[in-house]
UniProtKB/Swiss-Prot annotation:
Heterodimer of AddA and AddB/RexB. Belongs to the helicase family. AddA subfamily. Its EC number is 3.1.-.-, 5.6.2.4. Disulfide bonds: none annotated. Residues 12-487 form the UvrD-like helicase ATP-binding domain. This is ATP-dependent helicase/nuclease subunit A. GO terms for biological process: double-strand break repair via homologous recombination. Its cofactor is Mg(2+).
Length: 1242
């Protein structure tokens, strides 16, 4: 069957290749869509063309469209809906189009998981599955795994004669727990689920270990990867020797070295030849390997630089060959085979444990009526296929044939991120073979960055290699290489790098002409859009810093450099092209994104940017569990679950919930020094109080224990969500945190905890203990309950995000930071490794000697995984570079720039475009790749120094490369610190610091200088009456009374834990004012009734117990028996705690001298009481100053003192009332509760 392509309409906006992707049919089609090539638009247009065609149109529900995310599915439905509306506007009478709009909501446009769920709900009767099943929460699944693992291992430990199991435990667990074995079982189980037949895959793990002494080691699957690695290393060694030989033969070169170098070259060539022969011969040849000594080169005829360089190249070659001898080929083949035979029972035991776990776990999920996302795929696969009884091969089931008949075409977006199980499902619902099929796949394997989620990019690559442009041999492939996103400079720069970096062995594909990005946009000329590379030179030895500290400093330095550049971009300004208006506009903060490999150092970056006045934000999902309010509530829940936990209990008591101070906690601990803190608390409540402080603490302890008992009872009887909300109500904690800074976010955090409790109880688990364990699992996994605030597109901030998060997005200006950060290779050194092809491999542990060493399969998987990791990192770098529309900045921070450049220079003279495999494979960071590529460019600038091939050096890309000294970024503050370090150290050590005599007079003059307008410094725009009173005292009025005593030595207060807790006079005064404000003036105001009202105020938490004890009910009762008190009770109008604000001239308040006569000050205050009776308005201010003892009962003296101290305040009060209320104040009084007398204020 020939491929069919409808002719492109005249005037179409689509390129020829895009139209081919839209219109081609009749077979399976793979569209390799480069970044920015409009693949989503092409996919949508293909669907629109199919459903709106005037002839042969299909219904939208006869298409299966599979997307990578739910958001992508929703966007695609929206785009299709808009296109249908536009088409309907042109053809308003089309019943077919109206039908498509009605079918669209139910169309099969979804993620593959959603499609699987629909299949399962339709055919659930073919499975042993309750139709009311639900999809389990991820953490619920983790908890269930734990339970099943515990049950499995308990059974294994209980079996008699289970020697194999105990051998596994001894080999792969620590002395104290079997956590490592549990992790191994779960890792193998989850990895197996990415295979269409997980049980068969597990059962076949031992096949690689089916060897005997006659096995040819070269025939083993593992040997292929070992040989590939050896060939790469030997080729690299031969190339290094060749370059050393070229140096030896140069004028001034170490010519005596030439003969020895030729011998080395021949020896390495011989080893390369032996790679294709028996393994034993190669092992013997490497064992007998010997690099001879180089002859001496002395005299003026020889260039020392060339001598050193030649030696260095030979040493590098020796290291590579000797590493092969000492590692991969260190053992005789018979020894490798013996280890594999000894490993077989170990691997078989582990595989059987995983298979048993899989059965038990599946049964546990079925019992609870739950499935996970992996189950969706495998249940769907089970429904869609059946095994042919004769051939044993899988065939489409009747259900699959129904779907094949239902769907005219199956369209898959982001095909490069498909896994093996998903591929099997797609192959079952599509029709025909590749040559006659209806599978349409769109993706870009260069953007496949989800291998850690077990995506398999080789599925895409395999089809890309097999399919042809005309589709005659099978499937058809279409390359969409035109990029409509980026400026030419960005594309040229990206192409320049990847033409040198991405290859078949290292990179998994060749970055050839078809893969290169073609300029398709229409940007106007103008801005300098050349990519910029900035390398910060820290100029220090690597060992000076610990890795974490060095990384932290690198992030700070890079953030400072980015801040400097961002300021230039925004203020210079840099212009970006606005497609909506078709005009350039000034760049804004929202046009800029900072991309990083991980968010570890994002907080430091944000801090540095904001310190420079640059608004910055990042989607930081961490920190929820560290929030104070959440920490307190989780501690309270832990105490309710089990009060015998000292740390949570102490945290709760010390928190704002119960406000125990350190003295009270010490009293509690002393009540029972050896028991738990809870036991001490119970003992403390029961012991006789010896002091007032102890009695008060005991009341608090009793109240807490009573509440705790009630909450524990509630936890047993009611739901967890009800308990949490009741805690919020009982403690008023929800309202309390709302009044703190960031109160809305704090309350949102508490609501998130409540919501999570409700979600938890909708799962198969119940109870407070399990919930707390659930939370612990979340914390261990790094999950977070608090959703980060999503940023709106129009928020004018610089965004910081990971490269993975940026996939599918585009930004005018991109900063790619942290390029020198090493690749994460820790997983390659795990005691066991997994691979889809090679299976399971682990270190061999000698049962008697307890020594472990790598096995051949482990070395093979390590080699394979390292190349896969490098390919993934290369694709991640590609994604990052292709996010930029107009400007790209690449940043890195290194310890020694000169040393790094020297390391890269060897790449400059390499022939051809693609750098050798070993050069690319030896990279430890993105910077290693970029540096080795840029050093070959004419714009290498700071990096250049060696002649590169002309075809590479003259590439049309333009670069700006700069080495930035870190000192330029550390700032003036750091420079001062460095300069003054000796002086600061001398001061810290108490040594004399030398002074320069020339400055002494100036220092003295400055110290003795007095400000001419000192009084003006006390003038504020807003001032309280009490502050005004104190300032008047300070500047003269009542000066003798208030001036501090001179010449006394400072007296330091005792530490708080040694102080006796008493209220200050001000605190006592506040307590009395609270009582006077809340008393019911119509009640019988005698002493006993006032005392009962004080108790009520304590219960309402308007007063503390200490404050209540400081209030004298008899003094208050005396006031109400006096004439002024009786008038207050009988008044027709009473106002208590009257606030006011009054604008006055500064000169009037402070005196004319030293103040601006026209300046005004806002005076604020609160008047204790104003009432109105037949005499008019009467004003009272209550005073609690201790005057009786001070003036020995002389009330006249006391009255004069109070008038002098508060007269100004009262006159301001009177003036405020009269101006604001526009009514005269007839009488004005001070009432002193100490002595019970009234002072009239004129």
């Amino acid at each position: 069957m020939n491929a069919t392509i409808r002719p492109k309409p005249a005037g179409s906006r689509w390129t020829d290749e895009q139209w081919k992707a839209i219109a081609a049919g009749g077979r399976d089609i793979l569209v390799a869509a480069a970044a920015g090539s409009g693949k989503t638009a092409v996919l949508v247009e293909r669907i629109i063309q199919k459903v709106t065609a005037e002839e042969g149109a299909v219904d939208i529900d006869r298409l299966l469209v599979v997307t990578f995310t739910n958001a992508a599915a929703a966007e695609m439905k929206a785009r299709i809906g808009e296109a249908l509306e536009r088409e309907l506007a042109k053809r308003p009478h089309s019943l077919h189009l109206r039908r498509q709009l009605s079918l669209l909501p139910r169309a099969a446009i979804s993620t593959l998981h959603s499609f699987c769920l629909d299949v399962i709900r339709k055919y659930y009767y073919l499975l042993d599955l309750d139709p009311s099943f639900r999809i389990a929460d991820e953490t619920e699944i983790e908890l269930l795994k734990e339970d099943v693992l515990e049950e499995l291992l308990e059974e294994e430990y209980g079996k008699p004669d289970n020697e194999r199991f105990f051998a596994v435990v001894d080999a792969y667990t620590g002395d104290r727990s079997d956590a490592e074995l549990q992790e191994m079982i779960v890792a193998l189980y989850e990895f197996s689920r990415s295979h269409p037949e997980p049980d068969e895959w597990l059962a076949g793990l031992t096949s690689m270990y089916d060897v005997d002494e006659r096995t040819d080691i070269k025939t083993l699957p593992a040997a292929r990867y070992i040989a590939q690695h050896a060939a790469m290393e030997l080729a690299a060694a031969r190339r290094l020797i060749r370059r050393a030989l070229e140096l030896a033969e140069e004028p001034g070169g170490p010519r005596p070295y030439a003969e020895r170098l030729r011998e080395d070259r021949d020896m390495i060539t011989d080893l390369e030849t032996r790679l294709s022969g028996p393994w034993a011969e190669l092992h013997r040849a490497l064992k007998a390997l010997s690099f001879g000594r180089l002859p001496a080169c002395r005299g003026k005829d020889y260039d020392e630089r060339l001598i050193d360089e030649a030696k260095s190249l030979r040493d590098q070659a020796k290291k590579k060959v000797e590493a092969l001898r000492d590692n991969v080929f260190s053992l005789d083949p018979s020894v490798w085979l013996r280890h594999m035979r000894e490993m077989k029972p170990i691997v078989e035991t582990i595989a059987n444990l995983v298979r048993r776990f899989a059965v038990m776990f599946q049964a546990a999920k079925r019992e609870k009526g739950i499935v996970d996302f992996s189950d969706l795929e495998h249940y769907c696969l089970h429904i869609l296929r059946r095994r042919d009884p004769e051939t044993g091969e899988w065939q489409p089931s009747p259900a699959a044939l129904e779907y094949q008949a239902q769907f005219d075409e199956v369209l898959v977006d982001e095909y490069q991120d498909t896994n093996l199980v998903q591929e099997a499902i797609l192959q079952l619902v599509k029709k025909g073979s590749e040559r006659t099929g209806n599978l349409f796949m769109v993706g870009d394997v260069k953007q496949s960055i989800y291998r850690f989620r077990l995506a398999e990019p080789m599925l895409f690559l395999d089809k890309y290699k097999r399919f042809t442009a005309d589709g005659e041999e099978g499937g058809m492939k279409i390359d969409l290489a035109s990029n409509f996103r980026s400026r030419r400079e960005v594309l040229d720069g990206t192409n320049f790098l990847f033409a040198q970096l991405m290859g078949e062995t290292v990179g998994e594909m060749v970055y050839d002409e078809a893969a290169q990005l073609k300029y398709g946009a229409d940007y106007p000329e103008g801005e300098d859009a050349a990519p910029e590379v900035m390398i910060i030179n820290r100029q220090r030895a690597a060992e000076e810093d610990e890795e974490e500290a060095a990384e932290w400093e690198a992030a700070e330095l890079e953030a400072r450099l980015m801040a400097k550049k961002i300021k230039e971009i925004v203020s210079a300004p840099f212009y970006v092209y606005d497609r909506s208006s078709g005009q350039p506009r000034r760049a804004m903060y929202r046009d800029i994104v900072i991309l990083v490999r991980s968010m570890t150092n994002a907080p430091q970056m944000i801090e540095q940017l904001q310190a420079q006045g640059i608004p910055a934000a990042a989607d930081l999902s961490s920190g929820y569990f560290q929030a104070t309010e959440i920490s307190i509530m989780l501690s309270l829940l832990k105490v309710i679950d089990n009060p015998h936990q000292d740390i949570p209990l102490a945290a709760v008591l010390r928190s704002p919930l119960f406000r125990f101070d350190e003295n009270e906690l010490a009293m509690i601990r002393l009540a029972d020094p050896k028991g738990t803190f809870y036991e001490a608390l119970c003992s403390f409540r029961q012991k006789p109080a010896e002091t007032k402080e102890e009695a008060n603490a005991q009341r608090k302890a009793a109240a807490f224990l009573e509440r705790l008992e009630g909450w524990r009872t509630m936890a047993r009887r009611r739901s967890l969500a009800d308990l949490i909300w009741q805690l919020y109500r009982d403690t008023q904690f929800y309202d309390f945190v709302g009044a703190l800074p960031g109160g809305r976010q704090r309350q949102a955090n508490l609501r998130a905890l409540y919501d999570r409790a409700r979600q938890y109880e909708s799962t198969s688990f119940r109870g407070l203990f399990r919930f707390l364990r659930f939370i612990e699992r979340l914390q261990e996994r790094g999950d977070d309950l608090g959703a980060a605030r999503p940023l709106g597109e129009q928020e004018d901030v610089v965004r910081i995000m990971t490269i993975h998060s940026s996939k599918g997005l585009e930004f005018p200006i991109v900063f790619l930071a942290g390029l020198a950060r090493p690749f994460h290779t820790r997983d390659l050194h795990h005691p066991y490794l997994l691979d889809k092809e090679l299976g399971f491999a682990a270190r061999f542990v000698h049962p008697r000697l307890r020594i472990s060493y790598p096995t051949l399969p482990l070395l093979a998987i390590q080699t394979k995984k390292r190349l896969e990791l490098l390919a993934e990192e290369m694709r991640i770098l590609y994604v990052a570079l292709t996010r930029a529309k107009e400007k790209l900045y690449l940043l890195a921070s290194v310890n020694d720039a000169a040393k790094e450049i020297e390391k890269w220079k060897s790449a400059a003279s390499e022939r051809g475009w693609l750098l050798p495999d070993d050069v690319r494979a030896s990279a430890r960071s993105y910077l290693d790749w970029i540096g080795r590529a840029l050093i070959r460019h004419r714009d290498g600038g700071a990096l250049a120094g060696t002649k590169a091939p002309e075809e590479v050096a003259s590439h049309p890309s333009v670069w700006r490369v700069a080495i930035v000294p870190a000192a330029d970024l550390r700032g003036a503050e750091a420079a001062r610190e460095e300069m003054d370090g000796g002086v600061l150290l001398a001061l810290e050590q108490g040594r004399p610091v030398p002074v320069e005599g020339g400055w002494q007079k100036e220092v003295k003059r400055r110290l003795l200088w007095r400000y001419s307008y000192e009084k003006e410094t006390a003038v504020r725009a807003k001032q309280s009456v009490s502050e005004l009173k104190e300032q008047r005292a300070l500047f003269g009025e009542q000066a003798d009374e208030w001036r501090p005593r001179q010449g006394t030595a400072p007296v330091f207060s005792r530490p708080r834990f040694m102080q006796e807790k008493t209220l200050t006079p001000a605190e006592k005064g506040t307590a009395l004012h609270v009582v006077m404000r809340h008393l019911d003036l119509q009640a019988p105001l005698d002493e006993s009734w006032i005392r009962s009202q004080i108790v009520r105020l304590v219960e309402k938490e308007l007063l503390s117990a200490e404050q209540a004890e400081a209030v004298d009910p008899a003094a208050i009762a005396a006031f109400f028996t006096a004439d002024l008190g009786r008038r207050l009770c009988a008044a027709r109008e009473v106002h208590r705690e009257v606030p006011f604000s009054l604008g006055l001239k500064a000169a009037e308040l402070y005196g004319g001298e030293g103040t601006e006569s026209g300046r005004r000050v806002l005076v604020q205050g609160v008047i204790d009481c104003v009432f109105a009776d037949e005499c008019g308005y009467v004003m009272i201010d209550y005073k609690t100053d201790e005057v009786v003892h001070r003036f020995a009962g002389q009330k006249e003296e006391a009255a004069r003192f109070l008038l002098g101290r508060y007269g100004t305040q009262m006159r301001l009060y009177r003036r405020a009332i009269e101006q604001i209320w526009r009514a005269p104040v007839a009488e004005c009084y001070l009432y002193s509760f100490d002595g019970g007398f009234v002072v009239a204020v004129e």
